[in-house]
Amino acid sequence: STAVRDAQQRSGVAGPINALTIDVEDYFQVSALAWYIRRDEWDTRECRVEANVDRILGLLSEHGTQATFFTLGWVAERYPEMVRRIVAQGHELASHGHGHERASDLDAAAFRADVTRAKAILEDTAGVPVHG
């Protein structure tokens, strides 16, 4: 990832220092709750993602650590400023799909459409290319 390469250059260490990734999704979007919280109910739930990401950003800043944030397109649409803060603080932005679909539940065309949609939303929101 870009974050790892940047850390290597700053430290002068040839190998990876760490590879820290963070999934940016809300509690109600995990597949374990899919039977209890339908997608059409997501917008009715209290979102905690922004407060949690801001806390993580603070901790990473405090420790001089960079990470890759795998972010849902759904989240980026609702919290564009948060996505821009992630990038502004030097972290790598990557796609976690749009609606947290399980890849095993999608055919190739649906998977491609989901990933393409999320990538476009993330790039348009953050103004940086998304490679992951």
Where do the language-model regions lie?
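Catalytic alpha-helical scaffold of carbohydrate-active enzymes acting on polysaccharides/glycoconjugates
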Residues: 1-132
